[in-house]
Curated annotation (Swiss-Prot):
Protein topology in the membrane: Multi-pass membrane protein
Comp. bias intervals (Low complexity): 421-433
Species of origin: Salinispora arenicola (strain CNS-205)
Ranges of biased composition (kind: Polar residues): 437-451
Entry annotated with the keyword Membrane: yes
Gene: nhaA3
Record lineage: Bacteria, Bacillati, Actinomycetota, Actinomycetes, Micromonosporales
SS bond partners: none
Residue ranges crossing the lipid bilayer per the database entry: 32-52, 71-91, 109-129, 140-160, 169-189, 193-213, 220-242, 282-302, 312-332, 354-374, 380-400
Region spans: Disordered: 407-451
Record's protein name: Na(+)/H(+) antiporter NhaA 3
Pfam families: Na_H_antiport_1 (PF06965)
Main subcellular location: membrane
Keywords from the UniProt entry: Antiport, Cell membrane, Ion transport, Membrane, Sodium, Sodium transport, Transmembrane, Transmembrane helix, Transport
Length: 451
């Protein structure tokens, strides 16, 4: 072994080790563990004697002033690094819509409609609880409406080791649509000045990015400047900059140039290359920067939990979210006779609806826009978001782990890289006595390209 290694060029050894690290980071459990570790470190640090150092790190400003991008490290993590995660999530979502389980419109309608219910119901629960607290309290009606995609998928990766791949697809679709609705709510109800010119100008680098990819131009020296320009323009418009990541992902071709070849599509190549960066850097650093909420001891916790606004946020996340998701899912499946999909059960939907109650990124952002930073109510909102998200995650773990004690263990797809597991995804249920139709994975275009 050592002799062989000595014979290899140094660059080959480095590339091989880097490849192994990248493979580890592509596993959902690894990314989830890193994200949760970052969140735990942030919470401990923010409530320790060294909390001042944590605040100083988050508020440290860096970036070009002449581009109005002199942002704090916390802002760079929230608007910049998280855009990388949204790009990867957008790639996964487009793949499912084009070649995966959501390519049938009736099947895709279920998680999309569930996301709408998951926005409306928490807002309604919040308003009912805070109606008597005055108009100022009602400003936070949208706080429990958002789902944190990164945290929700991380928790699912850790607790859902034997869930069918369709569970992750449903949650991913629901969470992305949920957050896009929440971002639109911010643009309409919480943005004091929306700059239309940079928003419209975003179309220029976006179209150029799409044209290059359609012509199979993959030079990073051409694509990266266009992507950064699109991100900067979205940021300058006042819209949450992570939207740029989703927009860029949606223009990446999801099919190979020649569909009857085994060559991977550009979308698969991009996802394979960028996913380790998202899981190993972007998401854990974001968690470290955003999850540090100062609770203030037992007294601070009691004070927060007696505030109607905090109670409304927790109830919206823990009660409103699952209520809205389950109710709308039930309604859509009954009206359209679509069914839940491959290997999905109502136990899965109940657990996923609780995972949708994990609100961090966009919820914290709406909290900052609703109540002035440094005020007691703003601190209460942050504590409520952490508490509600933690309760939702624990309940989801209890629900989603139950069926697998007696269930099959062959679908260990969420714990591994979803790309590798997709070929073994479960097939649709059929009536007794009928054969099960063959299903071709999204990563097997050579065998049977999607129509």
């Amino acid at each position: 072994m050592d002799a062989t290694r000595r014979d290899l060029p140094p660059g080959s050894v480095v590339r091989r080790r880097a490849g192994r690290i990248a493979d580890v980071l592509r596993a959902e459990t690894t990314g989830g563990a890193l994200l949760l570790a970052g969140a735990v470190i942030a919470l401990i640090w923010a409530n320790s004697p060294g909390a001042a150092g944590y605040d100083a790190m988050r508020s440290f400003t860096i970036g070009p002033t002449w581009l109005h991008l002199d942002l704090s490290l916390a802002a760079w993590a929230k608007d910049g690094l998280l855009a990388v995660f949204f790009f990867v999530a957008g790639l996964e979502l487009k793949r499912e819509f084009v070649t995966g389980e959501l390519r049938q419109p009736r099947r895709a309608a279920v998680p999309i409609a569930a996301a709408v219910g998951g926005v409306l119901a928490p807002a309604a629960v919040y308003v009912l609880i805070t109606a008597a607290a005055g108009a100022d309290a009602l400003r936070g009606w949208a706080i429990p409406a958002a789902t944190d995609i990164a945290f929700a998928l991380a928790v699912l990766a850790v607790i859902g080791r034997h869930l069918p791949p369709a569970v992750r697809v449903f949650l991913l679709t629901l969470a992305v649509v949920d957050d896009l609705i929440a971002i639109m709510i911010i643009a309409v109800f919480y943005t004091a000045s929306l700059s239309v010119t940079p928003l419209l100008a975003t179309a220029l680098p976006l179209v150029a990015f799409a044209i290059l990819l359609r012509r199979r131009v993959t030079s990073v020296w051409l694509l990266l400047p266009l992507a950064l320009t699109a991100w900067a323009l979205v940021h300058a418009s006042g819209v949450h900059a992570t939207v740029a990541g989703v927009l860029l992902a949606l223009v990446v071709p999801a099919r190979p140039l020649h569909e009857h070849t085994a060559a991977p599509s550009l979308l698969e190549r991009f996802e394979h290359a960028i996913k380790p960066v998202s899981a190993g850097l972007a998401v854990p650093v974001f968690a470290l920067m955003s999850a540090g909420v100062a609770i203030g001891g037992l007294g601070g916790l009691v004070s927060a939990l007696t505030d109607p606004v905090a109670v409304g946020v927790i109830a919206g996340l823990v009660i409103g979210k699952p209520l809205g998701v389950i109710a709308v899912t039930w309604l859509i499946t009954r009206l359209t006779r679509t069914g839940l999909g491959n290997n999905l059960t109502w136990t899965h939907i109940t657990g996923l609806s609780m995972l949708a109650g994990i609100g961090f990124t966009v919820s914290l952002l709406i909290g900052e826009l609703s109540f002035a930073a440094g005020t007691e109510r703003h601190d209460h909102v942050k504590i409520a978001i952490v508490a509600g998200s933690l309760i939702a995650a624990v309940l989801a773990a209890v629900i989603l782990r139950r069926p697998h004690r007696a269930g099959p263990r062959g679908n260990d797809a969420i714990a591994r890289d979803p790309d590798q597991a997709r070929a073994g995804a479960a097939t649709p249920r059929t009536a007794p006595g009928h054969s099960t139709p063959a299903v071709t994975g999204a990563n097997q275009p050579a065998r049977s390209p999607a129509p």
